[in-house]
Amino acid sequence: MASPQPPFGGGSNSNSNTASPSNNLSPTASPLLEGRDSPNLPLTMTASTVLMTLPRDATAALAEAGKFGQEKVVIRFKPVGSAPALRREQVKVSSTERFDTVMTYIRKTLKCRESDSVFLYVNSVFAPALDEVVGNLWRCFKDSTNQLNVSYSMTPSFG
């Protein structure tokens, strides 16, 4: 009759690094190693619930988030350096237009050639991307008079 072995492999013939198939104390397989089809995989909070439709409150909030407070916003142009001044220093632009519309307007008004450079800066601080929406820029960077200040220059002016 075989003598019972201690639970942690204290026998003379046992190797402490390998588990025998008859040992019931071996750990269960890790859920990460079982495969993707295993139903025992833990789910994150975002993956545990699938929403087929959004609740009415969320749908209304998302619809309102894309709208702008004003249909048109006022942009005030300020020349920097040797850039010529514009006749109309303020213009109204649709809040849904992209910033490249503003660039096109400035280039046309200043009668720039294709090879001429024009640099635009919001609040004399940064140059926004041309695909940025004017309404978003106005919402984030308007001044106390509800105008978006755009400086323009023929040479790079601000960092």
Swiss-Prot record:
GO cellular component, as recorded:
Atg12-Atg5-Atg16 complex; autophagosome membrane; phagophore assembly site membrane
Outcome of gene disruption: Displays slower vegetative growth under nutrient starvation conditions and leads to the inability to form fruiting bodies.
Q: What is this protein called?
A: Ubiquitin-like protein ATG12
Bias (Low complexity) occurs at 13-27
Mind telling me which CDD domains this protein's record contains?
Answer: Ubl_ATG12
The task this protein performs is described as:
Ubiquitin-like protein involved in cytoplasm to vacuole transport (Cvt), autophagy vesicles formation, mitophagy, and nucleophagy. Conjugation with ATG5 through a ubiquitin-like conjugating system involving also ATG7 as an E1-like activating enzyme and ATG10 as an E2-like conjugating enzyme, is essential for its function. The ATG12-ATG5 conjugate acts as an E3-like enzyme which is required for lipidation of ATG8 and ATG8 association to the vesicle membranes. ATG12-ATG5 rearranges the ATG3 catalytic center and enhances its E2 activity.
Cross-linked residues for Glycyl lysine isopeptide (Gly-Lys) (interchain with K-218 in ATG5) are G159
The record ties this protein, via InterPro entries, to: Atg12, Ubiquitin-like_domsf
Enumerate the Gene Ontology biological process terms. Answer: autophagosome assembly; autophagosome maturation; autophagy of mitochondrion; glycophagy; piecemeal microautophagy of the nucleus; protein transport
Q: Which gene encodes it?
A: ATG12
Q: Where in the cell is it found?
A: Preautophagosomal structure membrane; Cytoplasm
The UniProt annotation puts the region (Disordered) at: 1-40
Question: What kind of membrane protein is this, topologically?
Answer: Peripheral membrane protein
Species in which this protein is naturally found: Sordaria macrospora (strain ATCC MYA-333 / DSM 997 / K(L3346) / K-hell)
